[in-house]
Amino acid sequence: CVQHNWGGIENLSLIPGTVGAAPIQNIGAYGVEVKEVIKSVTGIDLETGLFRTFLNHECAFEYRDSIFKSKLKEKFFISSVTLTLTKKTHRINTSYGAINDVLKQQHITTPTIQQVSDAVIQIRSSK
C-alpha cells in the first residue's frame, strides 16, 4: 500500500502480527490506530457458523480494545478486514516526536507516505 502511495497505515509499519489480529487489539503506533482506517471486519460467528460483517462503528473500538477482544472473544473468527486508505487527500501524521526527529535528521520537511513509513521502520529497527 505504502509503495503505491496509499496512506493511512504508514505509521503502523513493521508492527508484528496478522491483519486479522489488528482489529482485535486495535493496534496502534506513532499517533495512529488501525480503527482510523478500518471500514469493516468480516468473519464467521463460531456459534452459528454464519458469516457476519461489522462496520467500523459496530466494532466498539477503544484504546487497544474492540468487541472482538471482549464480547466476541473466542466467538468470532475474523476472515477479512476492509481498509479505507487515501491517496490524494491523505493527511500525513508526524505528531510523534521520534518520527519528526528522524525526518529532521534527513532534512525532510514535507514527507511523503513512504518517507514516514521508512522513518517508522528505522525507529522500530533501532529498538
Describe each region flagged by the PLM:
Residues 1-47:
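Anion-binding (especially nucleotide phosphate/pyrophosphate-binding) glycine-rich loop
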Residues 52-127:
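Phosphate/pyrophosphate- and phosphate-bearing ligand-binding catalytic cores of soluble enzymes
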